[in-house]
From Swiss-Prot:
GO molecular function: nicotinate phosphoribosyltransferase activity
Highest taxon in the source lineage: Bacteria
Organism, scientific name: Burkholderia cenocepacia (strain HI2424)
Cysteine-cysteine disulfides: none
Official protein name in the record: Nicotinate phosphoribosyltransferase
Function statement: Catalyzes the synthesis of beta-nicotinate D-ribonucleotide from nicotinate and 5-phospho-D-ribose 1-phosphate at the expense of ATP.
Keyword 4Fe-4S in record: no
Pathway: Cofactor biosynthesis; NAD(+) biosynthesis; nicotinate D-ribonucleotide from nicotinate: step 1/1
Keywords: Ligase, Phosphoprotein, Pyridine nucleotide biosynthesis
Membership in a protein family: Belongs to the NAPRTase family.
Annotated GO biological process: NAD biosynthetic process via the salvage pathway
Gene giving rise to this polypeptide: pncB
Length: 399
């Protein structure tokens, strides 16, 4: 069985789930899967994927896992008590061949947000591992280890990068769980203080690594349907986050509606309240410069704020960003696929995104063309109108 612990997921799933329990327990949502890698035939593996998901739905939290969560300063005891009763229910997920053909599969997760939020990360990890264990029956781990050593060597070679730290954000698109755990341990031992932590809660617990994460796109997307007014949905999301965490976990995700809309909403109050912001699409250098100017315009010293970069990073890009912004702000880098699925094979670009909340379409208007995902073109156009965002000429809104 691929997933053997419900902690084998990213920390931000638990931080968002706690907000859902306390503020949106009645919300109903729908998520959909998409593989962005062309020419990949996943249909032959449907039965294997279903079997693995069935195993996932048999899991419960162990006492030692609950105790670990309870010790986190931002996790409340009633949430841990809820998790003690929790399990994923197979009735909320369907996995079928897509009517489009071409090897595509449809994975639809639909049900109460509180009871479906933990599906995404392990299901993506399952799809990845099932695919690669069938297509690469004798993985070249030697090549993977050599590539990982080169990355560690590159980051640690120059003394001016001694304060440049990276984190593992690679659970969802990892080659396999065994390889992911080896990567996390190799980074911990090879980078020392340059390894900031991991988003994976299980490996954080097992190996005394710092767990990292705050919010994901789905949280701010859901607020489109849960807030009082669509135009204020991003503000509403940040306010509810602050209401729950009272200044803790203060990294705001910036690209649900694009950078312009984010800066319009992220006023002086939020600039001072939140510790920083996370970049996940668009040009990271331009984004960083705009964030620093925005902090200065709102009477915040950028040197006290954190810029988190997490979009398709590799070590050379991390180093370029560090060189550009070091000394001007605090920096954090989350590296995903390039760490956990770099053995010489083409990684799958797969996602599971929320598409509806309480029966209403929800969407992400990314700063990167092709990253937006919405099944309702009319709603996407309306959302752009409300937030004053132009339609990118090279984006297929139906994706």
């Amino acid at each position: 069985m691929i997933i053997t612990s419900l902690l084998d997921t990213d920390l931000y799933k638990f931080t968002m789930m706690q907000v859902v329990l306390h503020h949106f327990p009645a919300a109903n949502v729908e998520y959909r899967f998409r593989c962005r890698t062309p020419g990949v035939d996943l249909v032959p593996y449907i039965d294997e994927i279903r079997d693995e998901v069935r195993g996932l739905c048999s899991l419960r939290f162990a006492d030692v896992e609950l105790d670990y969560l309870r010790r986190m300063r931002f996790i409340k005891s009633d949430f841990v008590d809820f998790l003690a009763l929790f399990h994923l229910n197979e009735k909320y997920i369907s996995i079928t061949p897509s009517p489009k053909g071409n090897g595509e599969i449809d994975i639809v997760i639909e049900g109460p947000w509180l009871h479906t939020i933990l599906f995404e990360i392990p299901v993506l990890a399952i799809v990845n591992e099932v695919y690669f264990r069938n297509t690469q029956r004798e993985p070249d781990y030697r090549e993977g280890r050599e590539r990982l050593r080169e990355k560690i060597k590159l980051l640690g070679a120059k003394p001016e990068f001694a304060d440049c730290k990276i984190a593992d954000y690679g659970t969802r698109r990892r080659f396999s769980k065994v390889w992911h755990e080896e990567v996390a341990l190799t980074l911990r031992d090879g980078l020392g203080p340059q390894f900031a932590g991991t988003s994976n809660v299980l490996y954080a617990m097992k190996h005394d690594i710092t767990p990292l994460g705050t919010m994901a796109h789905e949280y701010l997307q859901a607020c489109q349907a849960l807030g009082p007014r669509l135009r204020d949905s991003q503000i509403y999301g940040f306010e509810m986050w602050a209401k729950e965490y009272r200044g803790d976990l203060g990294i705001a995700l910036s690209d649900v509606y694009g950078m312009d809309a984010f800066l319009n909403d992220f006023d002086m109050y939020f600039c001072k309240l939140f510790d920083g912001a996370r970049h996940d699409s668009g040009d990271p250098f331009e984004w960083g410069e705009r964030m620093l100017r925005h902090y200065e315009a709102n009477r915040c010293d950028p040197r006290t704020k954190v810029l988190v970069f997490s979009d398709a990073l590799d070590i050379p890009k991390v180093m370029q960003l560090y060189e550009r912004f070091r000394g001007r702000c605090k920096l954090a880098f989350g590296v995903g696929t390039n760490l956990t699925n770099d053995l010489g094979y083409v990684p799958l670009q797969i996602v599971i995104k929320m598409v509806r909340c309480n029966g209403q379409p929800v969407a992400k208007l990314s700063d990167s063309p092709g990253k937006s995902m919405c099944d309702d073109k009319a709603y996407l156009a309306y959302l752009r109108q409300v937030f004053g965002i132009a339609q990118p000429v090279d984006e297929d809104a139906s994706k």
